[in-house]
């Protein structure tokens, strides 16, 4: 749990699989529900946190139902179904612009596999009318620092249930990674990551809760 060197706790979790993940669609700010698998993933993540004794003082999630439902399921599993939960579009997934709602294979046919891969896995190149990961970070990080960090520094145990790219932005900041490093980081659906932070909210260690 917490130690003298790392008194503060932050848990990040990507939402469970959504119906659109299952269909291989670009989702972005579209709002599909969790799939049956996604509900099970969120429940399992919550069970694993409970088995390790984790509790929270406040939770944050996005304005999208797949993250909100994941957050709710986790809190139910750890025995805190009524915990204060703050929802903000600042934690939304990267906005995929013209790619949203398209099957990834269809997008590759339209623009070419290499171009689609550049949009997906470069730090500062955005798809048409969408956000790059850099743009996403510029939305997520000011909110994290102004709104979430004060709770961490008060010693509150914080849960954030969000999305692959909004969480990549946070992880890049927490771990001091470069843009090139963070675009290679894969985040499994529904698997919590526990960050142990020092008194100033800086990264000390982490634990992947995947078993």
UniProtKB/Swiss-Prot annotation:
GO terms for biological process: canonical glycolysis; gluconeogenesis. Keywords: Glycolysis, Isomerase, Phosphoprotein. It comes from the Eukaryota. Disulfide bonds: none annotated. GO terms for molecular function: phosphoglycerate mutase activity. GO terms for cellular component: cytosol; nucleus. Gene3D superfamilies: Phosphoglycerate mutase-like. Pathway: Carbohydrate degradation; glycolysis; pyruvate from D-glyceraldehyde 3-phosphate: step 3/5. This is Phosphoglycerate mutase. The modification Phosphotyrosine is found at residue 96. The active site is at residues 15, 93. SMART domains: PGAM (SM00855). The lineage of its organism: Eukaryota, Fungi, Dikarya, Ascomycota, Taphrinomycotina. It catalyses: (2R)-2-phosphoglycerate = (2R)-3-phosphoglycerate. The record marks 163 as: Transition state stabilizer. NCBIfam families: pgm_1, PRK01295.1. Substrate binds at residues 14-21, 27-28, 66, 93-96, 104, 120-121, 164-165. The N-terminus is blocked. It is an enzyme of class 5 (isomerase). Belongs to the phosphoglycerate mutase family. BPG-dependent PGAM subfamily. The modification Phosphoserine is found at residues 62, 166. CDD domains: HP_PGM_like. Monomer. The modification Phosphothreonine is found at residue 37. Its EC number is 5.4.2.11.
């Amino acid at each position: 749990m917490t130690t003298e060197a790392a008194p503060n706790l932050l848990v990040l979790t990507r939402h469970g699989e959504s119906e659109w993940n299952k269909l291989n669609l670009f989702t972005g700010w579209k709002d599909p529900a969790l799939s049956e698998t996604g509900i099970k993933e969120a429940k399992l993540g919550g069970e694993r946190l409970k088995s390790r004794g984790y509790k929270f003082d406040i939770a944050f999630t996005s304005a999208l139902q797949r993250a909100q439902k994941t957050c709710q399921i986790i809190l139910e599993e750890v025995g805190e179904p009524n915990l204060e939960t703050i929802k903000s579009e600042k934690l939304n997934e990267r906005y995929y612009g013209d790619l949203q709602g398209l099957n990834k294979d269809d997008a590759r046919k339209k623009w070419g596999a290499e171009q689609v891969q550049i949009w997906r896995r470069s730090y500062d190149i955005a798809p048409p009318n969408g956000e790059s990961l850099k743009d996403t970070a510029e939305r997520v990080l000011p909110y994290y620092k102004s709104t979430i960090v004060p709770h961490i520094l008060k010693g509150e145990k914080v849960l954030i249930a969000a999305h692959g790219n909004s969480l990549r932005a946070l992880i890049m900041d927490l771990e001091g990674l470069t843009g090139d490093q963070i675009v290679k980081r894969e985040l499994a659906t529904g698997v919590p990551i526990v960050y142990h932070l020092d008194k100033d909210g800086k990264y000390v260690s982490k634990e992947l809760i995947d078993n």
